[in-house]
Amino acid sequence: MKKTILFFNIFLLSLSSCVDEKVLNPVEQINLQSSRDYLLSENLFNHIYRSIEEGFIYNGQAKNCPSYTLLNQNINNSDTLIIDFGEENCLQFGQLKRGQIICTFNEKYHTSGSIINTTFSQFYINNILIEGNLELSCLDNNLYQLEISNTSLTTNYGVININGSLEKQMINGQNSIYNYLDDIYLVNGNISGNSSNGNSFDILISDPITYDLSCFQSSSCITQSGQAIITPNNYENRLIKYGFSGCDCDIIVEYNNETTLIVLD
């Protein structure tokens, strides 16, 4: 009987050890969750602004998906542009979208002094619900300020919350405002948020990130170069390095003397 109890206790210890090992593996993945969630949100914001700029260029043309509605066309007050993808998913630029992007604005997209305030109504990209407020101000013809306020991305594995302030300097494409695919921006700023596992984080762009919109012609990602430091709560800093190999969605994250490749979908 004693032998049986001993063997059973050894079995329990062995089982406990296996369980502990399985618990440790997800923790290691969670260490990169903030990095993954931030990179996902950055990519989705870039796609939102591609849709918005398309809307300002093509709002007078009839399209099935999306449709454009321009309201209050009065030069003395703000106008409203509704970019409507409908209630069912439709495909735009390789992304499934539904719902509405709603922009109120006082001037056109690239006009100095313009302020474009963006909200959402049941808007999804690839079945990720996006809510909150984005405000893009054109400080002059080449400099833009993006304020991200109370923005959330509801995914299958949790909610990502994002707030921040980014400065975008256009370094190419100034002379072709109706062809955004030759635009290149240098981006600086700070981001804070909560990842889908509930852990908070802060982002500091340490080396300006290059957004090359010509990459949209062959990829769903436009980040070409630059670096950002991400500080998740209770974890060491991670260094995000863009521009792994041209117009792709491969991004390197360095932490704790280790290098991890994150590939965005």
Pin down the residues of each PLM region.
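Sec-dependent N-terminal signal peptides
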Residues: 6-9
